[in-house]
Regions:
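Long amphipathic alpha-helical segments
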Residues: 1-23
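Glycine-rich phosphate-binding segment of PLP-dependent enzymes
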Residues: 36-37, 47-73
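N-terminal Rossmann-like NAD(P)+-binding subdomain of aldehyde/semialdehyde dehydrogenases
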Residues: 3, 11, 26-49
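Glycine/charge-rich, flexible interdomain linkers and switch-proximal surface loops
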Residues: 9-17, 32-40, 76-83, 107
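Short glycine-rich or small-residue beta-strand-to-loop segments that form or flank ligand, phosphate
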Residues: 40-44, 71, 121-123
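Conserved PLP-enzyme active-site core in the AAT-like
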Residues: 27, 74-210
Length: 210
């Protein structure tokens, strides 16, 4: 009325405006975008895309009840991990496996389950913070672990890990650097070497792949 667009307010006008407002407010927040950033697996754009066939199969399955946590052969409740654990064990030669929805959850649960109240040895150069305020020292504290830093920001050697391992050591951890690098006069210990050390000392070794 003030702008002059309408002369009077009727029930039809009110209903139409309410319908428009409701439609606008109920639009999904996820929008399709075209990724022209040059980063193929962009962390803010959903990372790896699912194949169309996979999407169609998932949609078909979840349009109906499925055996998510039910073992038909035994006629009783099952475990949702059963659908994928066998494949992971076959691919990795692991004794067992479980799945969570992101890497941060995997790191936290691993630390909390295997190293709670114990010490976790990590190279000082790997105390990173990545997107979403995922900070290694904070995650360890919340998981109930005690962080033991070894080496320096630029150089960490095998003997640094060897000297830090005690009867209180619950785990040795290696952390992915994500989106930065340390260059120049540097040194680090590779995955295989740390794994061999932990086997000899009979303690778990994990690698956060980011």
């Amino acid at each position: 009325i003030v702008s002059g667009e309408i002369r009077s307010v009727t029930a039809d006008i009110i209903l139409k405006k309410c319908e428009e407002a409701l439609e606008e407010s109920s639009q999904p927040s996820l929008k399709k975008v075209i990724n022209l950033t040059g980063t193929v697996l962009h962390t803010n754009f959903g990372r790896a895309l699912l194949p169309r066939k996979t999407i169609e199969e998932v949609g078909d399955k979840y349009a109906n009840p499925v055996t998510l946590e039910y073992d038909i052969s035994k006629g009783k409740r099952g475990d949702r991990d059963d659908h994928i654990v066998g494949l992971i064990k076959e691919l990795t030669n692991a004794e067992d496996a479980t799945i969570v929805n992101n890497n941060a959850a995997a790191v936290f649960l691993t630390l909390n389950s295997l190293a709670q109240k114990g010490e976790v040895v990590v190279s000082r150069s790997e105390l990173v913070e990545i997107g979403g305020s995922f900070r290694i020292p904070d995650i360890m504290r919340k998981a109930g672990c005690r962080l033991v830093e070894v080496g320096t920001t630029s150089r960490t050697h095998l003997e640094d890990f060897e000297d830090a391992i005690t009867e209180k050591t619950a785990m040795v951890m290696r952390v992915h650097w994500s989106n930065f690098k340390i260059t120049g006069f540097t040194a680090s210990v590779d995955q295989e070497t740390l794994a061999d050390l932990c086997k000899k000392r009979k303690i778990p070794f994990i690698e956060d792949l980011g």
